[in-house]
A protein has these predicted regions:
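Non-catalytic alpha/beta scaffold blocks inside enzyme catalytic domains
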Residues: 2-112
């Protein structure tokens, strides 16, 4: 799915991430993994920026790694089921003093 031209463009072959990475069609991979250390980014030669939990399993060292907190452990958050049936508030259990991924992304956007 692409929204590059302002409207949804669905083409399962054209926008297949595995194919795009293999063919080096992207400039960079931005990988967000704040829930589990097992959600590692794909191994690719494309430069990769990772916003992830400490201990995230990485297939290779990314160009940039920014540690972020886990919602419900390091900061408050909200867990939404994929089918949008249930939305659960998550409390900050104070495990670590790591920022929410949303704050990091907002800071990156503000710097651009």
């Amino acid at each position: 799915m692409s929204y590059a031209n302002g409207a949804p463009d669905y083409d399962p072959y054209r926008w297949a991430i595995g194919r795009m990475l293999k063919d080096k069609e992207g400039d960079l991979v931005l990988w967000l993994a704040s829930i589990s250390p097992d959600l590692s980014p794909p191994a690719t030669e494309v430069p990769t920026i990772v916003l992830g939990t400490p201990g995230l399993k990485l297939p290779k060292e990314p160009a940039v790694f920014i540690p972020v907190g886990t919602p419900g452990l390091d900061h408050a958050g909200r867990l939404v089921r994929v089918d949008n049936v249930v939305s659960l508030p998550l409390k900050d259990l104070g495990r670590a003093d790591l920022p929410p991924a949303a704050d990091v992304l907002a800071a990156i956007e503000a710097a651009l």
